[in-house]
């Protein structure tokens, strides 16, 4: 029996490239043995609703084609359900942090090859209050860069748009009082920003979590304490090399459950999109989603080798 795949795509991502190549993508998947259909999103929340519908219709595979925001919506559509379909990823956004972490090719046909080859691995996701995320949650003015950067600037200079906007915001940054409880420990004090990471790639910084594991059941918690502009610039430089973890203003920990609160009205960034405001409870859901990934990911330190699943297409 042929497997059924549903593509959920953002038609505006990647300068509408996927929309143009959709017919070829459908043909490629059909030749590989999939009965395939596609759905184009029109507004925020569409990908979540369509993922839920596809689950009810018992699709074997869901393919998210778009940026990290589209992927986040698809994950939110399936995370609470039993017998979740496998997830395929076609990175079409500006940064594509999750795709980077799993070494998924940025070209459409290369990403489809990963799905067709059939190798998959289970990865952790995070639950924040009543929603889910697959890459990161963060707070602090600098973390607002990804959803405050103009779309036109992103289309012109790509990922560099975030750095341009980030440097523009640096002088405005202010520390806020935070209480962060994590696995029996407590941080209480002034901080500029915090990150909860599930992968090694956040906002294009591929060494922000140098010891990341995608399936170990732990968040990486990074807290940047109150710092002056020179100190913050130094931390960012170190972060580009994965050398920030020992900086005296950086707290770097692993935790399964985290609670964050503040008297300040602090916005949250979840997978690159606006995620509401504090307070927030975070829980790591270990190996919760089964994702297609290149076979060589088994040789990477990001994945525990004894967890890797080799699930090939049944012809």
UniProtKB/Swiss-Prot annotation:
Q: What is the effect of changing residue 124 to A?
A: Loss of activity
Keywords carried by this UniProt record: ATP-binding, Kinase, Lipid biosynthesis, Lipid metabolism, Magnesium, Metal-binding, Nucleotide-binding, Phospholipid biosynthesis, Phospholipid metabolism, Transferase
What is its cofactor?
A: Mg(2+)
The listed outcome for residue 97 to A is: Loss of activity
Q: What region holds the DAGKc domain?
A: 1-132
**Residues at the active site:** 273
The record lists ATP as bound by: 10-14, 41, 67-73, 94
Q: Which GO terms describe its cellular component?
A: plasma membrane
Q: Which reaction does it catalyse?
A: a 1,2-diacyl-sn-glycerol + ATP = a 1,2-diacyl-sn-glycero-3-phosphate + ADP + H(+)
UniProt GO molecular function: ATP binding; ATP-dependent diacylglycerol kinase activity; identical protein binding; metal ion binding
Q: This protein's superkingdom?
A: Bacteria
**What does the entry comment about cofactor binding?**
Binds 1 Mg(2+) ion per subunit. This ion appears to have a structural role and is required for catalytic activity.
Q: Which PROSITE patterns match?
A: DAGK (PS50146)
Q: Which residues bind Mg(2+)?
A: 213, 216, 218
For this protein, what is the EC number?
2.7.1.107
Its GO biological process annotations read: phospholipid biosynthetic process
Its job: Catalyzes the phosphorylation of diacylglycerol (DAG) into phosphatidic acid. Is a key enzyme involved in the production of lipoteichoic acid by reintroducing DAG formed from the breakdown of membrane phospholipids into the phosphatidylglycerol biosynthetic pathway.
**What is known about its subunit structure?**
Homodimer.
Q: Which family does it belong to?
A: Belongs to the diacylglycerol/lipid kinase family.
Q: What is this protein called?
A: Diacylglycerol kinase
Which species is listed as the source? Answer: Staphylococcus aureus (strain MRSA252)
Supply the source organism's classification.
Bacteria, Bacillati, Bacillota, Bacilli, Bacillales
Gene, per the UniProt record: dagK
